[in-house]
Amino acid sequence: WIDGLTPTAKLRSKTKIIEQGTEPPIWGFDGSSTQQATGDQSDCVLKPVAQFPDPVRGGDNILVMCEVMNVDMTPHASNTRAALVESASNFSEFEPWFGMEQEYTFYEQSYDSLKYGQPLGFPPSGYPAPQGGYYCGVGADEVYGREISEAHATACIEAGLGISGTNAEVMPGQWEFQIGPVGAPDIGDHIWVARWLLYRIAEDWNISATLNPKPVKGDWNGAGMHTNFSTKQMREDGGYEAIVAACEALGKNADLHVKNYGADIEDRLTGDHETQSYDTFSYGVSDRGASIRIPWQVEVDKKGYLEDRRPNANGDPYVICLLYTSDAADDTSR
Protein backbone atom coordinates (compact mmCIF):
# COMPACT_ATOMS: atom_id res chain seq x y z
CA TRP A 1 0.00 0.00 0.00
CA ILE A 2 0.96 3.65 -0.33
CA ASP A 3 1.82 5.48 2.86
CA GLY A 4 1.20 9.07 3.94
CA LEU A 5 4.70 10.52 3.70
CA THR A 6 4.90 13.93 2.08
CA PRO A 7 5.83 15.35 -0.32
CA THR A 8 6.57 11.91 -1.83
CA ALA A 9 4.71 8.84 -0.63
CA LYS A 10 6.47 5.50 -0.21
CA LEU A 11 5.38 1.90 -0.59
CA ARG A 12 4.83 -0.33 2.45
CA SER A 13 4.20 -4.08 2.52
CA LYS A 14 3.75 -7.00 4.88
CA THR A 15 2.94 -10.69 4.60
CA LYS A 16 -0.30 -12.50 5.40
CA ILE A 17 -0.80 -16.26 5.22
CA ILE A 18 -4.30 -17.28 4.12
CA GLU A 19 -6.05 -20.55 3.33
CA GLN A 20 -5.50 -21.89 -0.19
CA GLY A 21 -8.17 -20.66 -2.59
CA THR A 22 -9.50 -17.87 -0.36
CA GLU A 23 -9.56 -14.23 -1.36
CA PRO A 24 -7.34 -11.72 0.46
CA PRO A 25 -9.44 -10.24 3.27
CA ILE A 26 -9.80 -6.71 4.55
CA TRP A 27 -6.77 -6.15 6.78
CA GLY A 28 -5.19 -3.32 8.76
CA PHE A 29 -1.98 -1.67 9.91
CA ASP A 30 -0.56 0.90 12.32
CA GLY A 31 -1.18 4.20 10.58
CA SER A 32 0.75 6.12 13.22
CA SER A 33 3.94 4.56 11.82
CA THR A 34 3.20 5.59 8.23
CA GLN A 35 2.08 9.22 8.70
CA GLN A 36 -1.55 8.16 8.19
CA ALA A 37 -2.93 8.28 11.74
CA THR A 38 -2.21 9.47 15.26
CA GLY A 39 -1.17 7.15 18.06
CA ASP A 40 -4.46 7.44 19.91
CA GLN A 41 -6.44 6.47 16.77
CA SER A 42 -3.83 4.47 14.93
CA ASP A 43 -5.81 1.86 12.99
CA CYS A 44 -6.04 2.14 9.21
CA VAL A 45 -7.74 -0.34 6.90
CA LEU A 46 -6.25 -2.17 3.90
CA LYS A 47 -8.79 -2.85 1.16
CA PRO A 48 -7.54 -5.28 -1.54
CA VAL A 49 -8.16 -3.84 -5.01
CA ALA A 50 -5.82 -5.75 -7.34
CA GLN A 51 -3.75 -8.92 -7.15
CA PHE A 52 -0.89 -10.35 -9.19
CA PRO A 53 1.18 -13.55 -9.18
CA ASP A 54 4.19 -13.09 -6.88
CA PRO A 55 7.34 -13.64 -8.98
CA VAL A 56 9.59 -13.33 -5.92
CA ARG A 57 8.14 -16.19 -3.88
CA GLY A 58 6.63 -18.04 -6.84
CA GLY A 59 4.13 -20.85 -6.49
CA ASP A 60 0.58 -19.80 -5.67
CA ASN A 61 1.70 -16.72 -3.76
CA ILE A 62 0.27 -13.35 -4.76
CA LEU A 63 0.99 -9.66 -4.46
CA VAL A 64 -2.04 -7.65 -3.37
CA MET A 65 -2.36 -3.93 -4.07
CA CYS A 66 -4.48 -2.24 -1.42
CA GLU A 67 -6.24 1.07 -0.98
CA VAL A 68 -5.94 2.68 2.44
CA MET A 69 -9.31 3.32 4.08
CA ASN A 70 -10.49 4.90 7.31
CA VAL A 71 -12.16 2.61 9.84
CA ASP A 72 -15.56 3.76 8.55
CA MET A 73 -14.47 2.46 5.10
CA THR A 74 -14.26 5.89 3.51
CA PRO A 75 -11.09 6.56 1.48
CA HIS A 76 -8.19 7.82 3.58
CA ALA A 77 -6.91 11.31 2.72
CA SER A 78 -3.74 9.72 1.31
CA ASN A 79 -5.76 7.39 -0.96
CA THR A 80 -5.32 8.87 -4.45
CA ARG A 81 -6.62 5.78 -6.23
CA ALA A 82 -10.25 6.15 -5.12
CA ALA A 83 -10.74 9.48 -6.90
CA LEU A 84 -9.21 8.08 -10.09
CA VAL A 85 -11.58 5.11 -10.05
CA GLU A 86 -14.55 7.48 -10.02
CA SER A 87 -13.12 9.74 -12.73
CA ALA A 88 -12.14 6.83 -14.97
CA SER A 89 -15.66 5.46 -14.69
CA ASN A 90 -17.12 8.79 -15.79
CA PHE A 91 -14.96 8.83 -18.93
CA SER A 92 -14.86 5.09 -19.68
CA GLU A 93 -16.73 5.48 -22.98
CA PHE A 94 -13.76 7.44 -24.35
CA GLU A 95 -11.40 4.56 -23.58
CA PRO A 96 -8.40 6.54 -22.30
CA TRP A 97 -5.10 4.65 -22.52
CA PHE A 98 -1.89 5.43 -20.68
CA GLY A 99 1.71 4.40 -21.20
CA MET A 100 4.21 5.46 -18.53
CA GLU A 101 7.99 5.52 -18.85
CA GLN A 102 9.37 5.06 -15.34
CA GLU A 103 12.96 6.25 -14.97
CA TYR A 104 15.00 5.45 -11.85
CA THR A 105 18.59 5.46 -10.60
CA PHE A 106 20.57 2.67 -8.93
CA TYR A 107 22.69 3.51 -5.88
CA GLU A 108 25.41 1.49 -4.13
CA GLN A 109 24.37 0.50 -0.58
CA SER A 110 27.32 -1.60 0.62
CA TYR A 111 28.74 0.13 3.69
CA ASP A 112 32.14 -1.46 3.11
CA SER A 113 32.35 -0.03 -0.40
CA LEU A 114 34.15 3.21 -1.21
CA LYS A 115 31.26 3.88 -3.57
CA TYR A 116 28.57 3.76 -0.84
CA GLY A 117 25.83 6.25 -1.68
CA GLN A 118 27.08 6.79 -5.23
CA PRO A 119 25.03 6.07 -8.36
CA LEU A 120 26.18 2.89 -10.08
CA GLY A 121 28.87 3.74 -12.59
CA PHE A 122 30.17 6.72 -10.62
CA PRO A 123 33.69 6.56 -9.15
CA PRO A 124 34.27 6.87 -5.36
CA SER A 125 34.88 10.59 -5.87
CA GLY A 126 34.36 12.87 -8.82
CA TYR A 127 32.36 11.98 -11.90
CA PRO A 128 32.43 9.50 -14.77
CA ALA A 129 32.86 10.50 -18.41
CA PRO A 130 30.24 13.02 -19.60
CA GLN A 131 26.86 11.89 -20.89
CA GLY A 132 26.65 10.72 -24.46
CA GLY A 133 27.53 7.03 -24.58
CA TYR A 134 25.35 5.61 -21.83
CA TYR A 135 21.84 5.88 -23.33
CA CYS A 136 20.81 2.44 -24.64
CA GLY A 137 24.47 1.49 -24.35
CA VAL A 138 26.14 -1.89 -24.15
CA GLY A 139 29.34 -2.95 -22.43
CA ALA A 140 30.71 -2.77 -18.90
CA ASP A 141 32.17 0.67 -19.56
CA GLU A 142 28.77 2.15 -20.44
CA VAL A 143 26.04 0.21 -18.63
CA TYR A 144 25.68 -0.43 -14.90
CA GLY A 145 23.00 -2.57 -13.26
CA ARG A 146 21.72 -4.42 -16.31
CA GLU A 147 21.34 -7.69 -14.38
CA ILE A 148 18.91 -6.00 -11.98
CA SER A 149 16.97 -4.34 -14.79
CA GLU A 150 16.67 -7.69 -16.59
CA ALA A 151 15.57 -9.51 -13.43
CA HIS A 152 13.00 -6.81 -12.80
CA ALA A 153 11.62 -7.00 -16.34
CA THR A 154 11.25 -10.77 -16.04
CA ALA A 155 9.49 -10.39 -12.69
CA CYS A 156 7.05 -7.85 -14.16
CA ILE A 157 6.20 -10.27 -16.97
CA GLU A 158 5.68 -13.13 -14.52
CA ALA A 159 3.45 -10.88 -12.39
CA GLY A 160 1.24 -10.13 -15.40
CA LEU A 161 2.07 -6.43 -15.45
CA GLY A 162 1.76 -4.54 -18.72
CA ILE A 163 5.49 -3.98 -19.14
CA SER A 164 6.43 -3.15 -22.71
CA GLY A 165 10.17 -2.48 -22.57
CA THR A 166 13.29 -1.31 -20.74
CA ASN A 167 16.41 0.67 -21.61
CA ALA A 168 19.53 2.17 -20.09
CA GLU A 169 19.13 5.93 -19.72
CA VAL A 170 21.28 9.00 -20.38
CA MET A 171 23.07 9.10 -17.00
CA PRO A 172 25.18 6.18 -15.74
CA GLY A 173 23.25 3.94 -13.37
CA GLN A 174 19.94 5.29 -14.66
CA TRP A 175 17.35 3.00 -16.24
CA GLU A 176 13.78 3.04 -17.46
CA PHE A 177 10.93 0.59 -17.81
CA GLN A 178 7.71 1.21 -19.68
CA ILE A 179 4.22 0.11 -18.70
CA GLY A 180 1.33 0.34 -21.14
CA PRO A 181 -0.83 0.97 -22.95
CA VAL A 182 -3.13 0.25 -20.02
CA GLY A 183 -6.37 1.89 -18.91
CA ALA A 184 -7.03 3.58 -15.58
CA PRO A 185 -6.87 2.80 -12.70
CA ASP A 186 -4.96 -0.33 -13.78
CA ILE A 187 -1.99 1.68 -15.07
CA GLY A 188 -1.46 3.09 -11.57
CA ASP A 189 -1.68 -0.37 -10.00
CA HIS A 190 0.87 -1.70 -12.47
CA ILE A 191 3.32 1.17 -11.92
CA TRP A 192 3.16 0.93 -8.12
CA VAL A 193 3.56 -2.86 -8.11
CA ALA A 194 6.40 -2.61 -10.64
CA ARG A 195 8.10 -0.09 -8.35
CA TRP A 196 7.73 -2.46 -5.40
CA LEU A 197 9.23 -5.30 -7.42
CA LEU A 198 12.13 -3.06 -8.45
CA TYR A 199 12.94 -2.16 -4.84
CA ARG A 200 12.52 -5.74 -3.65
CA ILE A 201 14.67 -7.31 -6.38
CA ALA A 202 17.42 -4.68 -6.02
CA GLU A 203 17.63 -5.66 -2.32
CA ASP A 204 19.24 -8.94 -3.37
CA TRP A 205 22.15 -7.01 -4.91
CA ASN A 206 22.38 -4.61 -1.96
CA ILE A 207 21.44 -1.84 -4.37
CA SER A 208 18.74 0.79 -3.91
CA ALA A 209 16.61 2.17 -6.71
CA THR A 210 15.47 5.76 -6.26
CA LEU A 211 12.98 7.99 -8.04
CA ASN A 212 14.84 11.22 -7.26
CA PRO A 213 13.98 13.57 -10.15
CA LYS A 214 17.46 15.14 -10.15
CA PRO A 215 19.79 12.52 -8.65
CA VAL A 216 23.01 14.36 -9.56
CA LYS A 217 23.25 18.14 -9.78
CA GLY A 218 24.95 19.70 -12.77
CA ASP A 219 25.16 18.54 -16.37
CA TRP A 220 23.33 15.26 -15.83
CA ASN A 221 19.85 14.27 -16.92
CA GLY A 222 17.06 14.09 -14.37
CA ALA A 223 14.62 11.21 -13.96
CA GLY A 224 11.07 11.52 -15.21
CA MET A 225 7.98 9.46 -15.87
CA HIS A 226 6.94 10.56 -19.34
CA THR A 227 3.25 9.83 -19.75
CA ASN A 228 1.77 8.80 -23.09
CA PHE A 229 -1.95 9.37 -23.42
CA SER A 230 -4.70 8.76 -25.94
CA THR A 231 -8.47 8.48 -26.18
CA LYS A 232 -10.55 6.50 -28.64
CA GLN A 233 -11.09 9.71 -30.62
CA MET A 234 -7.34 10.35 -30.81
CA ARG A 235 -6.61 6.83 -32.04
CA GLU A 236 -9.24 6.84 -34.78
CA ASP A 237 -8.63 8.04 -38.35
CA GLY A 238 -8.51 11.82 -38.34
CA GLY A 239 -7.76 11.90 -34.62
CA TYR A 240 -4.97 14.45 -34.96
CA GLU A 241 -7.38 17.32 -34.26
CA ALA A 242 -8.35 15.66 -30.98
CA ILE A 243 -4.65 15.34 -30.08
CA VAL A 244 -4.09 19.05 -30.67
CA ALA A 245 -7.26 19.82 -28.68
CA ALA A 246 -5.90 17.76 -25.79
CA CYS A 247 -2.60 19.67 -25.90
CA GLU A 248 -4.48 22.97 -25.78
CA ALA A 249 -6.59 21.73 -22.86
CA LEU A 250 -3.49 20.66 -20.95
CA GLY A 251 -1.99 24.10 -21.49
CA LYS A 252 -4.95 25.77 -19.80
CA ASN A 253 -4.21 23.95 -16.54
CA ALA A 254 -0.44 23.68 -16.91
CA ASP A 255 0.32 25.06 -13.44
CA LEU A 256 -2.05 22.62 -11.73
CA HIS A 257 -0.49 19.69 -13.54
CA VAL A 258 3.11 20.69 -12.82
CA LYS A 259 2.33 21.18 -9.12
CA ASN A 260 1.00 17.62 -8.97
CA TYR A 261 3.56 15.85 -11.15
CA GLY A 262 6.02 15.10 -8.34
CA ALA A 263 8.08 16.91 -5.70
CA ASP A 264 11.11 19.04 -6.66
CA ILE A 265 9.99 19.29 -10.25
CA GLU A 266 11.73 22.66 -10.58
CA ASP A 267 15.08 20.89 -10.19
CA ARG A 268 14.37 18.77 -13.26
CA LEU A 269 12.27 20.97 -15.56
CA THR A 270 14.90 23.63 -16.19
CA GLY A 271 14.71 23.96 -19.97
CA ASP A 272 17.88 21.88 -20.31
CA HIS A 273 18.48 18.13 -20.60
CA GLU A 274 15.50 17.47 -22.86
CA THR A 275 12.97 19.40 -20.76
CA GLN A 276 10.86 22.52 -21.01
CA SER A 277 11.02 24.92 -18.07
CA TYR A 278 8.49 24.16 -15.34
CA ASP A 279 6.91 27.63 -15.70
CA THR A 280 6.47 27.45 -19.48
CA PHE A 281 4.06 25.32 -21.51
CA SER A 282 4.62 24.26 -25.09
CA TYR A 283 3.89 21.38 -27.43
CA GLY A 284 5.39 20.34 -30.73
CA VAL A 285 6.13 17.50 -33.11
CA SER A 286 9.29 15.52 -32.24
CA ASP A 287 10.28 18.23 -29.74
CA ARG A 288 11.86 16.70 -26.63
CA GLY A 289 12.38 20.19 -25.29
CA ALA A 290 8.62 20.80 -25.20
CA SER A 291 6.18 20.10 -22.39
CA ILE A 292 4.18 17.84 -24.71
CA ARG A 293 5.77 15.94 -27.59
CA ILE A 294 3.70 14.73 -30.53
CA PRO A 295 5.65 11.83 -32.09
CA TRP A 296 6.54 12.31 -35.76
CA GLN A 297 4.69 9.13 -36.74
CA VAL A 298 1.53 10.51 -35.15
CA GLU A 299 1.75 13.61 -37.35
CA VAL A 300 2.23 11.38 -40.42
CA ASP A 301 -0.65 9.06 -39.52
CA LYS A 302 -2.88 11.93 -38.32
CA LYS A 303 -3.87 9.84 -35.31
CA GLY A 304 -2.32 8.28 -32.23
CA TYR A 305 -1.20 9.73 -28.91
CA LEU A 306 0.75 12.48 -27.14
CA GLU A 307 3.68 12.29 -24.74
CA ASP A 308 3.67 14.51 -21.65
CA ARG A 309 7.34 14.96 -20.74
CA ARG A 310 6.73 16.87 -17.51
CA PRO A 311 5.88 14.21 -14.86
CA ASN A 312 8.67 13.41 -12.42
CA ALA A 313 9.94 9.91 -11.74
CA ASN A 314 8.53 10.31 -8.21
CA GLY A 315 5.08 11.33 -9.42
CA ASP A 316 1.97 9.44 -8.31
CA PRO A 317 0.51 7.69 -11.39
CA TYR A 318 -2.98 7.80 -9.88
CA VAL A 319 -2.81 11.59 -9.58
CA ILE A 320 -1.35 12.04 -13.06
CA CYS A 321 -4.08 9.90 -14.61
CA LEU A 322 -6.77 11.73 -12.64
CA LEU A 323 -5.61 15.05 -14.06
CA TYR A 324 -5.71 13.59 -17.56
CA THR A 325 -9.15 12.05 -17.32
CA SER A 326 -10.55 15.29 -15.92
CA ASP A 327 -8.80 17.63 -18.39
CA ALA A 328 -7.58 16.09 -21.64
CA ALA A 329 -10.20 13.35 -21.93
CA ASP A 330 -12.98 15.79 -21.10
CA ASP A 331 -11.82 18.26 -23.76
CA THR A 332 -11.31 15.71 -26.55
CA SER A 333 -14.71 14.15 -25.84
CA ARG A 334 -16.59 17.26 -26.83
Regions found by a protein language model. Give the residues of each.
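Conserved small/polar residues in nucleotide/adenosyl-binding loops
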Residues: 324-329
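Conserved hydrophobic/aromatic pocket- or pore-lining residues that grip, position, or stack substrates
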Residues: 104, 198, 227
